[in-house]
Amino acid sequence: MFNFDNTLGYEPPLDVHNLTDEQTAISIENLNLFYGQAQALHDISMRIPKGRVTAFIGPSGCGKSTLLRCINRMNDLVEGCKVTGKVRLHGKNVYHPNVDVATLRRRVGMVFQRPNPFPKSIYENVVYGLRLQGVKNSRTLDDAVERSLRSAALWDEVKDRLHENAFGLSGGQQQRLVIARAVAIEPEVLLLDEPTSALDPISTLTIEELINELKTQYTVVIVTHNMQQAARVSDHTAFIHMGKLIEYSDADSIFTSPMKKQTEDYITGRYG
């Protein structure tokens, strides 16, 4: 069926359909999303476990990035977007009227397809979010820079050039810098929207190895069009098609013995 070889680290899978509240980082309940009159997500319910990597896979335009962006309400920025249902982060509905969206996005970091460092130094990129929070102590900022760059496997490469422009880094280094910027504010969850789609194979492998390290500190949710990548990095995988959650299980089951024919057809290349 599929050569499942998660060489980047393996933990016994959880039963994602019977997670306890303690095991759950994100609970999505009867989620529907509309862009104007067009419905993009249809009644999605799932629980995403803490401290694991969960991958969303599916054909282009299937709704996987839309679903990802519901977790930190990035879809709020799209005119005409309407959401029904609930997305709970550690038990609290992020769509509750009293939720401060800026605070939510500090708790849920996000990395996009293309590296997007700011036109600032490497140092200032990392501390950007901390400065917005009012952190001014130099020692605190210095410590955060080293901690975050180490977490992003970038410290040894840039420790002697922290005050150089971030645009001088390679594409792979820039993406790791963006990850360092995201983790500097110590989020609970990291959302990765096709984070290696613009990178070369060597940089892609570095990011994949980094993802395996990041899950020791954060809950990671990744959207990827690359099924081999999903098999390598994810503990659990959700297959989405036409805005519907078709199948969700541990990655090994999805890629070697899927329960749904739609899933099997997709991962064997019959469509998508």
Swiss-Prot record:
EC numbers: 7.3.2.1
SMART domains per record: AAA
UniProt KW Hydrolase keyword: no
ABC transporter domain mapped to chain residues: 26-267
GO molecular function, one term: ATPase-coupled phosphate ion transmembrane transporter activity
CDD domains: ABC_PstB_phosphate_transporter
Catalytic activity: phosphate(out) + ATP + H2O = ADP + 2 phosphate(in) + H(+)
InterPro entries: AAA+_ATPase, ABC_transporter-like_ATP-bd, ABC_transporter-like_CS, P-loop_NTPase, PstB-like
Annotated residues for binding of ATP: 58-65
GO CC term, one of those recorded: plasma membrane
Keywords, comma-separated and alphabetical: ATP-binding, Cell inner membrane, Cell membrane, Membrane, Nucleotide-binding, Phosphate transport, Translocase, Transport
Assembly and oligomerization: The complex is composed of two ATP-binding proteins (PstB), two transmembrane proteins (PstC and PstA) and a solute-binding protein (PstS).
Role description: Part of the ABC transporter complex PstSACB involved in phosphate import. Responsible for energy coupling to the transport system.
Similarity annotation: Belongs to the ABC transporter superfamily. Phosphate importer (TC 3.A.1.7) family.
PANTHER family: ABC TRANSPORTER I FAMILY MEMBER 17 (PTHR43423), IRON EXPORT ATP-BINDING PROTEIN FETA-RELATED (PTHR43423:SF12)
Listed name of the protein: Phosphate import ATP-binding protein PstB 1
Organism annotation: Vibrio parahaemolyticus serotype O3:K6 (strain RIMD 2210633)
Taxonomic lineage: Bacteria, Pseudomonadati, Pseudomonadota, Gammaproteobacteria, Vibrionales
Protein encoded by which gene: pstB1
